């Protein structure tokens, strides 16, 4: 219940509506406007037209989940709402919009028969994000989405959890990176193994056979087996009814006397489990490639390939789809060849990562310079992130190139990364680049420009920050303005900074970034009422973080943020304020 702007759209004669708070009415179609195209794409992909009479999407304040796929009426948290300047960077909610829509096939049309099989809902919804980005923005974008999903799984403590879990403490435990991101990556591998035709025809059979009913992982297996003609029992036993993932050590060598390339793959996971893995190994001589399908089935597998000369590159998992941790003995020349000739997103990403670690090598520098002009913004941004222009050996190679690219870079986050890199030069000449960009339509670019300007002309940056403080600010510009006013201001800035901090969404990175500057302002604050309000805001943020993350975040809040405030206040002899902070720390 609330005051909403209702923005109407349609798909094949069916109502498609977007409910947003009135101020977001003018940009509702920029947020949700790809929905009809998604409906067309997912209908074609599954072979099942969107099966419901209408589709509405609405936002709500303080919603406990990110979003929920209520049939025909998806509810999104308020973080979905973005103004025009935020959308200049990207639509941060586009993946979630695709995710919840795809649930109308996998979750609503066919529903998981129990919490244990939740992944047949959530893995498909998660994977829909990869599918959508691949379709809409190209294979690199889809591969990047897939990579970040794999990272989310690998970074957590998830190796002991089966994808289908019959034992769990609470049903909420099932909503994790295993059911979602790991499940999505397992589908990606399965698609690669079966091929697109069999995979998507299998999904169609699964949906049409089980429509308006409940189903489990075995129903999915049977549908895919019927269409593909392949036995998938081993795959489902390994990935759906098992836990963990392979850790692979891959060693490449060449035996000149035998004219033979050798690949040794060792599984090093300490679980007692050996994975069965179909994959491809590509062997390159210049631009020429030979492809070889192999099966990894033992603790150590060795493969031999006839090769008249030493290969320029041997590329294991050449489609880059395996859910695995890999260690390879490739050298710089191998990765350079991989970047220019293998070509998919992960091939290029791996090469840029390696060159970042070998950045003092001339060949690595040359590749990074080329990567600044990569066709995909994700690779351009990654290459920029490897550069530290505080170091003279890097400045002399990269500085002028980055400065020349700022004006022509179309992707706003990459442009912002370039500005941040230039800021590290402490070169006053770049003020002519920074000053116009503090008014850029992108909050991210404007914030990066203002932060860089503050390094070379703090007085000018302070004046601009004061002027901006009277406007509605978000994202990085908000953080930078607040940081500058906190750094150079005094207690008089408390009301503005506290108000800004309190309004930030707890899911935004800006809230974390602002916590330290806000704490520094509280160190300067002597008014007990204002000081307590500030401490309460920090504690409110600490307590609002989901319980599963607090083992990581609580030490930061308690020992770094609040601990630093206590230390500073003790040095100043402000015992009353020390007591206020001590009272909100956990009892030891």
Spans of features found by a protein language model:
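Amphipathic alpha-helical scaffolding segments comprising HEAT/armadillo-like alpha-solenoid repeats
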Residues: 328-338, 360-372, 392-407, 427-439, ...
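Short inter-helical turns and helix N-cap capping residues of alpha-solenoid HEAT/ARM repeat scaffolds
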Residues: 343-344, 375-377, 410-411, 441-442, ...
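Hydrophobic helix-coil surface modules that form long, contiguous segments used
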Residues: 1-98, 127-130, 329-333
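Acidic/His/Gly-enriched intrinsically disordered linker/tail segments
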Residues: 67, 122-185, 189
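Beta-strand-rich binding/interaction modules
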Residues: 232-233, 243-317
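Amphipathic alpha-helical substructures
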Residues: 24, 169, 176-263
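Zinc-dependent metallopeptidase catalytic helix centered on the HExxH motif
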Residues: 36, 76, 82-143, 203
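Structural detector for internal amphipathic alpha-helices that build alpha-solenoid repeat scaffolds
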Residues: 320-324, 347-359, 370, 380-393, ...
